Amino acid sequence: MRRWLIVLSTVLIAAATHTATDVAAPRAWAGDAPIGHIGDTLRVDTGTYVADVTVSSVAPCDPPPGFGYTRSGVPIKSFPGSTPNRADVTVRAVRVPNPFIMATAFSFTGVTPYADAYKPRTTDAPDDLDNVLVNAPNGAIVRGGVYWDAYRDPVSNVVLLDRKTGHHLAQWNL
């Protein structure tokens, strides 16, 4: 009886391993995404739209209007020196099917040296990148800011992700 139990468990484990290796893993797009340094203009081509994107700087800033709660100054939830960060981003729409496609697709994530990722915070600032990308027809050049609440470590990489699929579109290293 014990021998049959061992044989049965071995067969089940082998079948599960074989099934797991046959399942198609999602394609990793990070190898296809351009990687550059701050100030480099990177071409983002998804097949649906093409844009030239430049992240020119990342620096601490005062909280913009509508930023909401910040963790700075709260000893339990923040580290000393934590503050909102702002990235200056310039986007040139090379080929877009409609003027607002990049506003619905772009998500700039700030990543720390220890792999903490900060999602962009929506603000009421007039130069917020989400606000200016709403009207970016072919050939338009728009410039705006992306804001993060960097409550642990400072941002060392800016990663452009597709908001809908999560694909890695571009990356800038500081």
Language model features with spans:
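Conserved functional micro-motifs across diverse proteins
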Residues: 7, 24-86, 92-174
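Secretory targeting and sorting signals
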Residues: 1-25
